[in-house]
């Protein structure tokens, strides 16, 4: 198979080859190229030792911050390429990093330390694909398989557990039986991994086309670092609005929303409070009053634990809190929604509600979708016509109220909000004169 290596990467490989060293593109770039995906990064492995690499690239701009592990960053044509000496990893005491590395001249030994067969391939134009572990065949069959002993691979670096789930989710691969068994067996090792790294892999996993399958088959793995999901497993909903238990509803809702990180994380967390909120009536029907607030409280802890950025978390929490707010064709409700969560979040909320509805039963589904469509159209009308829905669009401001003799800041704010409420409820037009007259009446009372 011919892989088109970019000229800047080829230049680095040729520089090593011309100096009598082996050099290959390796790992994810080879995998992606074989799958027809444009690689973002081209990593290079070589038989040259670190000091030899420095000599080979003495006329290049280089960065040596990874040199003790055998990695030299080489600048070629304005691009950075990581060039790493073939190596064998020593013992892993922290389930993340080897205590030491030993350099080798053997490419196969270097490839043998890698995580999955699809990532254990190398390529250059002269030798073609070097594939000692059958990675190309596994890619062709859509199989994710560890290189060698899965238990050993996951004990070396526990993050590989989540990385494997991400690959399976994004590439649609089936996880080979012994690899899958080892993932379940070693899931607790994820407790040794930094939450920032877990966050990155989880986000990628949620973005995948096969997310529904992975979250169903490997839910206990996710529960290692998000134990709050456990109560939703197999928790029945017993209502005509639902056909799935709570966890399966969550999973199908993720699969039903676009591949946007905020939206997919929101769907993962939006109903976690249902088991706590559940009550059962005399007819055996479950109700989940207040589950939005409980879900948001649980979500806040999870997002903080996984070190999500504040802005990302705030958006998720607003969407979770308001995900069951149905506007029922009322522009007044929509204006209150816009005032509470803002324009962009309101648009996102409708996407959340569509995904939520898609993961429910067929009972009134068409009517629910129609209601969301109507609310969306009315929202755009309100925005296009610059209708008043917040203090910013109110025709009076704090200075106007202060001029009427109200001096205390809190009282000014309360009066402005009262006027806004009157405008939204259409008791008074959004006209400065009318609002000032009404404000004067409130002050005089």
Task: Annotate each PLM feature.
Residues 1-445:
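Catalytic cores of the polymerase beta-like nucleotidyltransferase superfamily
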């Amino acid at each position: 198979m011919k892989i088109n290596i970019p000229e800047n990467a080829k230049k680095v490989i040729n520089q090593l080859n011309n100096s009598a060293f082996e050099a290959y593109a390796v790992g994810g770039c080879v995998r992606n190229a074989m799958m027809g995906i444009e690689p973002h990064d081209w990593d290079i492995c070589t038989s040259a030792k670190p000091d030899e690499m420095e000599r080979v690239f003495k006329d290049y701009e280089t960065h040596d911050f990874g040199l003790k592990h055998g990695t030299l960053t080489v600048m070629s044509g304005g691009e950075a390429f990581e060039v790493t000496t073939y190596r064998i990893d020593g013992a892993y005491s922290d389930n993340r990093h080897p205590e030491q590395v030993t350099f080798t001249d053997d490419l196969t030994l270097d490839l043998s330390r890698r995580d999955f067969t699809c990532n254990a391939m190398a390529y250059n134009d002269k030798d073609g694909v070097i594939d000692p572990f059958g990675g190309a065949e596994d890619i062709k069959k859509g199989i994710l398989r560890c290189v060698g002993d899965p238990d050993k691979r996951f004990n070396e670096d526990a993050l590989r557990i989540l990385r494997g789930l991400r690959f399976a989710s994004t590439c649609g691969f089936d996880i080979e039986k012994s690899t899958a068994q080892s993932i379940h067996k070693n899931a607790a090792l994820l407790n040794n991994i930094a939450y920032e790294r877990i966050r990155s892999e989880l986000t990628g996993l949620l973005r995948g086309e096969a997310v529904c399958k992975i979250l169903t088959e490997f839910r206990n793995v996710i529960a290692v670092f998000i134990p709050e999901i456990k109560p939703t497993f197999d928790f029945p909903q017993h209502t005509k609005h639902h056909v799935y238990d709570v966890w399966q509803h969550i999973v199908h809702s993720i699969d039903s929303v676009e591949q946007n990180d905020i939206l997919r994380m929101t769907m993962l967390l939006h109903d976690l409070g249902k088991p706590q909120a559940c009550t059962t009536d005399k007819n055996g029907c479950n109700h989940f009053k207040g589950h939005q607030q409980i879900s948001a409280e649980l979500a806040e802890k999870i997002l903080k634990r996984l070190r999500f950025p504040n802005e990302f978390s705030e958006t998720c929490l607003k969407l979770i809190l308001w995900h069951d707010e149905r506007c029922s064709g009322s522009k007044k409700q929509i204006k209150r929604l816009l005032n509470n969560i803002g324009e962009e979040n309101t648009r996102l909320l409708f996407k959340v509600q569509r995904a939520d509805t898609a993961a429910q039963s067929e009972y009134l589904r068409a009517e629910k979708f129609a209601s969301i469509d109507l609310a969306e159209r009315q929202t755009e009308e309100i925005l296009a016509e610059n209708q008043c829905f917040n203090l910013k669009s109110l025709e009076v401001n704090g200075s106007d109220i202060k001029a009427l003799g109200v001096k205390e800041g809190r009282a000014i704010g309360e009066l402005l909000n009262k006027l806004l409420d009157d405008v939204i409820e259409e008791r008074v037009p959004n006209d400065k004169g009318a609002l000032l007259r009404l404000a004067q009446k409130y002050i005089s009372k």
